[in-house]
């Protein structure tokens, strides 16, 4: 639980004392404030019966902003018996709208009406009998820094796991009081990556050509084991101290913005960690599903959109818990949903993030999450939100996208972007087959794309080869050694419709198999940790395969940045013919045509068949850098060869 030092004072720049004690020039100020608030904590403990120095008041959110679209502000107060207090306010043009006192007297939820309020500091006054207490609070002015810029098909996301990317600050490897710290490099232990490492290596990511960084959750996960992955949050308003501070996170986002890059925050509103104070000290039994008692989900999330589903299947899918250590939030409780909604807004305003990835999206309440999306999009019109929609069919995925054509009888999800898991599955299997004209190899990708009418907006599909929960694209080293396999996959990923996403290490041909555990999929990035023999950030000691894969990835990414045809263009494809799959992207007269030989034999391409996407008798091949002549009626392609023909040059 945050200390009273953090909760009762945040200075004008939003810096907590935790931030200041790591800043040498502020050490004296920190000592003075530390003493001042220790005295204050003792004084407050005398004012409220049962409130000892070991039970400071937790105030969430710690501050807010004026001028927000939704002018109702929920302030949660958490301390011993605080719910027995009466509340009043000392402020200008702010009034107490309502009070929510849950069954647990350790909570008090104060709802304020701020629609006339200007930026100001004010006080909440608590009283129990003759005992009084004043809590300082601030309504800040909104700044004009970039935030909620969104992301779209012009971007390429780079998914990384902070604990496994780079350790640049050894001082936070062990944080006193937290349940898990670095012990060894076992796959499921903490390894020490942090925000300092991510910030230090922004130049690497910028040079690679990605535009948007998606780290897995950075919020505090004070769990006894497995805390490195970040999906069992124990404090929704604090960056995990083993990564750094809230200030460090804002500095990371600012540094990305200075390079013209964006940041997507991974949020988890379906569940939290079992060590979260909201679960260990329940406001009441309705905050979590099944009366806050563990009931395992059946994972059959198709039941949520199945017109024939039984009530028990629907219940098990959405109200069941992912695992026993991840209590399942009840989003139908309006106080829960207000808490979560404000948390998302707080991080956008405080850190300036550009987009949100929402974990396990279909497992949460559809109606509540639709309202969440709608409120955020009203406040931030350019914001993009992608939900983790892990279903195995395009129909299943499409039911969760805004304006879905297939979600009959359900509310509009309002979710702009969904994840194209079916395409990921195809890319991982079809390329290992020999393409025919019907149902093998690239024909399977052709068939899948031909069904895009099922999606409300195919351009708002997040596409990827793998992520932190799946086999890597190369699940064994033998696959990684097939250079053509990755060349075909990365070409498809970066030139088809949708918003591409890379998983850290894709550009280095990293291989891993989920059968060895999730930790095996989340290897350390080479060069991010002390004593690494290979340094991908500098290129030192890269293997020939790593060098080849990195160069190929960088070439395509940098080219894509300047190619509007593959970002915004229309899509036209041809049924595979003699093992070759051909498609084109066209935008304002600019044509890019891709040809892929999906067989283990050379191919002779009949160019007349593809005349409508060959506007000139020659083109520039992006991959080889050579000029390709197209004036002889046919074109020879090598085994598994890929051509990316850019007609702009």
Give the label of every model feature segment.
Residues 630-649:
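C-terminal beta-strand-rich structural cap/linker in extracellular carbohydrate-active enzymes
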Residues 69-121, 125-129:
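Immunoglobulin-like IPT/TIG beta-sandwich domains and homologous Ig-like subdomains
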Residues 132-141:
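Edge beta-strands of extracellular beta-sandwich domains
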Residues 165-345, 350, 369-380, 384, ...:
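Substrate-binding/active-site clefts of carbohydrate-active enzymes
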Residues 168-190, 391, 458, 464-467, ...:
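Loop/helix patches that line or flank the sugar-binding groove of alpha-linked glycan CAZymes
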Residues 253, 271, 343-345, 349-455, ...:
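Active-site-proximal helices and loops of the catalytic beta/alpha 8
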Residues 65, 140-159, 164, 168:
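Low-complexity, Pro/Ser/Thr- and charge-rich linker/hinge segments at domain boundaries
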Residues 53-83, 141:
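Beta-strand/beta-sandwich contexts
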């Amino acid at each position: 639980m945050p200390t009273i030092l953090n909760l009762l004072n945040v200075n004008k720049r939003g810096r907590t004392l935790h931030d200041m004690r790591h800043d040498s020039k502020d050490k004296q100020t920190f000592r003075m404030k530390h003493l001042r608030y220790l005295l204050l904590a003792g004084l407050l403990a005398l004012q409220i019966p049962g409130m000892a120095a070991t039970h400071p008041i937790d105030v969430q959110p710690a501050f807010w902003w004026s001028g927000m679209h939704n002018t109702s502000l929920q302030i949660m107060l958490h301390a011993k018996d605080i719910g027995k207090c009466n509340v009043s306010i000392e402020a200008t043009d702010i009034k107490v709208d309502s009070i929510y006192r849950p069954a647990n007297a350790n909570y008090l939820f104060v709802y304020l009406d701020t629609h006339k309020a200007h930026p100001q500091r004010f006080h909440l006054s608590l009283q129990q009998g003759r005992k009084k207490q004043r809590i300082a609070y601030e309504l800040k002015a909104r700044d004009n820094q970039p935030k909620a810029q969104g992301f779209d098909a012009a971007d390429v996301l780079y998914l990384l796991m902070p604990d496994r990317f780079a350790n640049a600050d050894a001082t936070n490897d062990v944080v006193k009081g937290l349940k898990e710290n670095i012990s060894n490099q076992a796959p499921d232990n903490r390894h020490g990556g942090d925000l300092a490492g991510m910030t230090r290596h922004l130049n690497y990511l910028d040079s690679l050509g990605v535009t948007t960084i998606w780290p897995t959750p950075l919020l505090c996960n004070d769990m006894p084991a497995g805390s490195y992955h970040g999906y069992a949050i124990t404090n929704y308003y604090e960056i995990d101290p083993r990564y750094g501070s809230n200030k460090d996170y804002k500095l990371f986002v600012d540094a990305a913005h200075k390079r013209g890059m964006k940041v997507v925050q991974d949020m988890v509103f379906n569940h939290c960690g079992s060590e979260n104070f909201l679960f260990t000290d329940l406001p009441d039994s309705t905050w979590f599903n099944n009366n806050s008692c563990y009931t395992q989900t059946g994972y059959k999330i198709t039941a949520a959109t199945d017109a024939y589903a039984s009530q028990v299947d629907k219940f098990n899918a959405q109200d069941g818990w992912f695992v026993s250590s991840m209590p399942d939030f009840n989003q139908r409780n309006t106080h829960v949903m207000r808490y979560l909604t404000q948390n998302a807004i707080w991080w956008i305003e405080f850190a300036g993030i550009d987009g949100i990835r929402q974990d396990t999206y279909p497992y949460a309440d559809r109606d509540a999450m639709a309202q969440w999306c709608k409120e955020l999009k009203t406040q931030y019109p350019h914001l993009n939100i992608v939900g983790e929609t892990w279903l195995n069919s395009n129909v299943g995925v499409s039911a969760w996208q805004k304006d879905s054509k297939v979600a009959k009888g359900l509310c509009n999800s309002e979710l702009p972007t969904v994840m194209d898991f079916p395409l990921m599955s195809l890319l991982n299997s079809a390329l290992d087959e020999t393409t025919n004209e019907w149902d093998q190899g690239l024909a399977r990708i052709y068939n899948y794309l031909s069904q895009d009418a099922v999606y409300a907006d195919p351009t708002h599909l997040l596409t990827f080869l793998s992520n932190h929960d799946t086999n890597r694209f190369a699940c064994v080293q033998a696959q990684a050694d097939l250079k053509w396999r990755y060349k075909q996959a990365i070409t498809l990923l970066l030139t088809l419709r949708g918003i591409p996403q890379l998983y850290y290490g894709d550009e280095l041909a990293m291989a891993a198999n989920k059968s060895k555990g999730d930790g095996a999929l989340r290897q350390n990035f080479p060069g991010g940790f002390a004593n690494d023999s290979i340094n991908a950030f500098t290129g030192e000691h890269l293997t020939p395969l790593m060098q080849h894969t990195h160069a190929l990835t960088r070439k395509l990414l940098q080219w894509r940045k300047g190619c509007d045809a593959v970002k915004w263009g229309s899509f036209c494809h041809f049924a595979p013919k003699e093992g070759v799959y051909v498609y084109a992207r066209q935008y304002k007269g600019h044509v890019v045509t891709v040809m892929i030989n999906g067989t283990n034999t050379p191919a002779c391409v009949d160019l007349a068949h593809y005349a409508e996407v060959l506007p000139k008798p020659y083109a520039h091949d992006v991959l080889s850098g050579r000029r390709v002549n197209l004036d002889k009626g046919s074109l020879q392609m090598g085994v598994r060869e890929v051509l990316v023909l850019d007609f702009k040059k």
